Structures are given as structure tokens and as C-alpha cells.
């Protein structure tokens, strides 16, 4: 049995400017797009005028997919060995390993993104937000254990980790962005 204790911690932050105030001040922005390839995410840093300053790709998607595929093969092999007559929590260790693997990669990529944001003196991180139906179809098409599936976990981790560094994370609807 796994019990997790979450204790809320109060932490003061000196930079409490809103996104609008930061944009008017000409702060740098990191825009991130998640992928389903070897790169978990691609990011570009823009200055206040919209000029590109730096570009970065965070890799490891193939490695993550490979580890997940190996664990799923072990689960399938275990189920075939018992002829589908499994009772209880037979493959729990494999499922927990998959869960911990996704948490590990989520934290790892989040830390890399945040390190890059701090190096580039970024004030706002922008993540894409899609409508629910589109997200559901894309996630279903990418598979449960593909790199794209980690985008929600990475977004959640980025939210609280960036706040500690005085960076605001926002989600912007991605409709029509490709037309610009």
C-alpha cells in the first residue's frame, strides 16, 4: 500500500507582477510546444517585441517510450503465462514502475525546462491549451505511454516549480496559432 502525504507549504514570492504587467515591462517569454517524438518539448524564448532569442529541444521521448514498451511487454507476458486467470494485484509492481517512470520523466523534463528558463531570464512560460475533444483524440492517438501523454504531468509540475522561481506559467488556447 502506498500512502502519500501532501503538506501545503507557504512560500513568499517577491515577484508578484501579473502577466499583463510583465508583458508591458517587456519581459522575456518561453513558449513551449509538446511533441510525440524523441523531443518531449520544443521551446522558444521571445523578448518583449516578439524577437526570437533562443530555441531549445528537450529530448528523451524515445528512451521513455522504450522503457514503457518493455514494461508493457512484461505485463503482457505475465498475463499470457497465467492464461488470463489473474486475481488480485498480480502485476502491480509493473504498473507502479510505469507510474514512477512517468513521474520521474515528468520531473526531469520539468527541471530541464525550468533551468533553461532561469538561464534565459524568462518571466512567463506559455503552454498550449487545446479544447477537450481535440486533446482526448490526440492523446488516444499517441498512446497511453507516449511522450505526448506526459505533457499534462509536465504542465502540472511546471506550475508549482516555476512559481518558486518567480515565473508565471499560463496556458493559451492554441486555436489558429499555425495561421499566424
Regions found by a protein language model. Give the residues of each.
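Positively charged, helix-rich recognition surfaces that bind polyanionic ligands
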Residues: 3-180
Amino acid at each position: 500500500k502506498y500512502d502519500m502525504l501532501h503538506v501545503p507549504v507557504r512560500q513568499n514570492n517577491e515577484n508578484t507582477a501579473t502577466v499583463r504587467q510583465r508583458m508591458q515591462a517587456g519581459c522575456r517569454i518561453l513558449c513551449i510546444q509538446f511533441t510525440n517524438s524523441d523531443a518531449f518539448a520544443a521551446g522558444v524564448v521571445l523578448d518583449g517585441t516578439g524577437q526570437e532569442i533562443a530555441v531549445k529541444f528537450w529530448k528523451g521521448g524515445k528512451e521513455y517510450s522504450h522503457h514503457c514498451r518493455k514494461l508493457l511487454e512484461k505485463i503482457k507476458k505475465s498475463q499470457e503465462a497465467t492464461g488470463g486467470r489473474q486475481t488480485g494485484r498480480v502485476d502491480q509492481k509493473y504498473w507502479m514502475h510505469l507510474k514512477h517512470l512517468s513521474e520521474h520523466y515528468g520531473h526531469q523534463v520539468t527541471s530541464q525546462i525550468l533551468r533553461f528558463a532561469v538561464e534565459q531570464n524568462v518571466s512567463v512560460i506559455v503552454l498550449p491549451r487545446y479544447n477537450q475533444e481535440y486533446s482526448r483524440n490526440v492523446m488516444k492517438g499517441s498512446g497511453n505511454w507516449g511522450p505526448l501523454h506526459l505533457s499534462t504531468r509536465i504542465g502540472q509540475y511546471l506550475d508549482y516549480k516555476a512559481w518558486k522561481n518567480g515565473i508565471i506559467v499560463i496556458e493559451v488556447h492554441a486555436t489558429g496559432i499555425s495561421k499566424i
